[in-house]
C-alpha cells in the first residue's frame, strides 16, 4: 500500500516541483493550501494546479480569521519586531500551517509531511521544529533542500515534468504573503547594492505616486487588540485587510533591510506590511498612555525576546507561553483610540485617548497656574533620589577631586 504524505502547498515553483518528485519516491501526495490572506491568489486555481501536477488530493483551508486572532494579535500586543524592523510576516504563519498539516496527516493516517523550503532559509527550521514538537514520530521530506536544487535546476525539472513555471530566470523572485504582509527575496534583490525595482512591490505605492493629501484613521484597541476603524467594529482579519489598502496607498510599510537569519547567514529582504506599520505604531502609542512606567520600561525586553522566539521557530515553547502570559497581563488596560495620520510613507500617531485607563493627568502635567503638581516636594525627592550616588562619590571620588587635592591647589 502506498504511504500517504501531506505537503504544504503554495502553488509556487518549489512546492509544485515537489509533487512529482515525491510521487517518484513512492508517496501518495495530499496537497494542503492554507489561505492566510495571500493577496490576489486564486485558491481554486491553486487547488486545481496541485491535482494537475500529480497530487491525489488537494485541500484548501480558509484560516484567515484564525491566523489574525490567534497569531497576529499576540504580535501586536507584544510589539514584536525582529531586529527592530521585521514584523514577522512569514515567520508568523508557519506555526499555524504546521498545526493544520499535522492535524490533516493524523486524519488521513499519513506517515510524512513535506515542505518546499531550501537549505538557505529559516523556514526549514520553522517547519521541522514545529513538526517535531507536535509529532516527533512524523517523517519529514524536504525535496528542494535534500536534492539541493538551484533555481535553474528546479525550472528545468518543472519543464521536464509538465509543471507550469510561474516565474522566469530574468526575474526569479521568491514571494511569500499573508494578511500581515508580503516578503520578497531572490533574483536581483540578492545584490544589496541594487535598489529594489518597483516590480518587487505589490501592496504599496511608490512615495512619488502617493496622494498629496494625508488621510486620517482612528484605531480602537480593546485589551491591546485592534477592534475598530473610525468607530466601525470589525473582525481583526477584515480590519487588517482594510488597513493594508488604506496605508498601502500612501506608501506605508516598505522595509528593505539586511537580516540575520537563524541559519547563520545574512539576507537582503524586501517586506511590505502596511497594516502592521499602522497598528504597531498606534498600539505602542496607546501603551505610552496607559502602561505604568516600570511596566513600560520592562516590556520592551520581553518584546525583543518574544520576537526572537517567533523568528527562531520557538512559538511552541514554554518560554514563549510564559512571556506571552506577562504580555497578556499588561494589555488589560490598553484600551482606547489612537488617531493615525497616513502620509507619504509615514504612519504617525497624532492624537490618543483612553476614557478609563489613561494615566495622563493634565492637571499634573500642565505648566500653567492650574497645575496640581507639588513642586516643593521636588527638593527632598531629588536629595533622596541621588543619595546612594552622592555617598559613593564622597567616598571614592571617581568624578570629583579629593579634599586633599583641593588643598594642594590652594
Swiss-Prot record:
Matches recorded under CDD domains: ASS (cd01999)
Chief location: cytoplasm
Database matches in PROSITE patterns: ARGININOSUCCIN_SYN_1
Compartment list: Cytoplasm
Keywords tagged on the record: Amino-acid biosynthesis, Arginine biosynthesis, ATP-binding, Cytoplasm, Ligase, Nucleotide-binding
Pathway: Amino-acid biosynthesis; L-arginine biosynthesis; L-arginine from L-ornithine and carbamoyl phosphate: step 2/3
Catalytic reactions on record: L-citrulline + L-aspartate + ATP = 2-(N(omega)-L-arginino)succinate + AMP + diphosphate + H(+)
One Pfam family linked to the record: Arginosuc_syn_C
Claim: Thylakoid is one of the keywords in the record: no
Amino-acid positions noted as binding ATP in the UniProt annotation, renumbered to this chain: 8-16, 116
Keyword Amino-acid biosynthesis annotated: yes
Binding site for L-aspartate: 118, 122-123
GO biological process: argininosuccinate metabolic process; L-arginine biosynthetic process; urea cycle
A GO term for molecular function: ATP binding
Binding site for L-citrulline: 86, 122, 126, 174, 259, 271
Entry EC number(s): 6.3.4.5
Assembly description: Homotetramer.
Family, per entry: Belongs to the argininosuccinate synthase family. Type 1 subfamily.
UniProt name for this protein: Argininosuccinate synthase
Organism of origin: Leuconostoc citreum (strain KM20)
Protein encoded by which gene: argG
Amino acid at each position: 500500500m502506498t504511504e500517504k504524505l501531506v505537503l504544504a502547498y503554495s502553488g509556487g515553483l518549489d512546492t509544485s516541483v515537489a509533487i512529482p518528485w515525491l510521487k517518484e519516491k513512492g508517496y501518495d501526495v495530499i496537497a494542503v493550501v492554507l489561505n492566510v490572506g495571500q493577496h490576489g491568489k486564486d485558491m481554486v486555481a491553486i487547488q486545481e494546479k496541485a491535482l494537475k501536477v500529480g497530487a491525489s488530493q488537494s485541500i484548501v483551508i480558509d484560516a484567515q480569521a484564525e491566523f489574525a486572532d490567534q497569531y497576529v494579535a499576540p504580535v501586536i500586543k507584544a510589539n514584536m519586531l525582529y531586529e527592530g524592523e521585521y514584523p514577522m510576516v512569514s515567520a508568523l504563519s508557519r506555526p499555524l500551517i504546521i498545526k493544520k498539516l499535522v492535524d490533516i496527516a493524523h486524519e488521513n493516517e499519513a506517515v510524512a509531511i513535506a515542505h518546499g523550503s531550501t537549505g538557505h532559509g529559516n523556514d526549514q527550521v520553522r517547519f521541522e521544529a514545529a513538526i517535531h514538537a507536535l509529532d516527533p514520530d512524523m517523517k519529514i521530506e524536504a525535496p528542494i533542500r535534500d536534492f539541493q536544487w538551484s533555481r535553474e535546476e528546479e525550472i528545468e525539472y518543472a519543464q521536464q515534468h509538465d509543471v507550469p513555471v510561474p516565474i522566469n530566470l530574468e526575474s526569479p523572485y521568491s514571494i511569500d504573503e499573508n494578511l500581515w504582509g508580503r516578503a520578497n527575496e531572490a533574483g536581483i534583490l540578492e545584490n544589496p547594492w541594487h535598489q529594489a525595482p518597483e516590480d518587487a512591490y505589490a501592496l504599496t505605492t511608490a512615495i512619488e505616486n502617493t496622494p498629496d493629501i494625508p488621510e486620517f484613521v482612528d484605531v480602537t484597541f480593546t485589551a491591546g487588540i485592534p477592534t475598530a476603524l473610525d468607530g466601525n467594529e470589525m473582525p481583526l482579519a477584515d480590519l487588517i485587510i482594510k488597513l493594508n489598502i488604506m496605508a498601502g496607498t500612501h506608501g506605508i510599510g516598505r522595509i528593505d533591510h539586511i537580516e540575520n537569519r537563524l541559519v547563520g547567514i545574512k539576507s537582503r529582504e524586501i517586506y511590505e506590511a502596511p497594516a502592521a506599520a499602522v497598528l504597531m505604531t498606534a498600539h505602542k502609542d496607546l501603551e505610552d498612555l496607559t502602561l505604568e512606567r516600570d511596566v513600560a520600561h520592562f516590556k520592551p525586553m520581553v518584546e525583543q525576546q518574544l520576537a526572537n522566539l517567533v523568528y527562531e521557530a520557538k512559538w511552541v515553547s514554554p518560554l514563549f507561553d510564559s512571556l506571552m502570559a506577562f504580555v497578556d497581563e499588561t494589555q488589560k488596560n490598553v484600551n482606547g483610540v489612537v488617531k493615525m495620520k497616513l502620509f507619504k510613507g509615514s504612519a504617525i500617531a497624532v492624537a490618543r485617548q483612553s476614557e478609563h485607563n489613561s494615566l495622563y493627568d493634565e492637571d499634573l502635567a500642565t505648566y500653567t497656574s492650574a497645575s496640581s503638581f507639588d513642586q516643593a516636594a521636588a527638593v527632598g525627592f531629588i536629595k533622596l533620589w541621588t543619595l546612594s550616588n552622592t555617598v559613593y562619590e564622597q567616598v571614592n571620588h571617581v568624578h570629583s577631586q579629593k579634599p586633599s587635592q583641593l588643598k594642594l591647589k590652594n
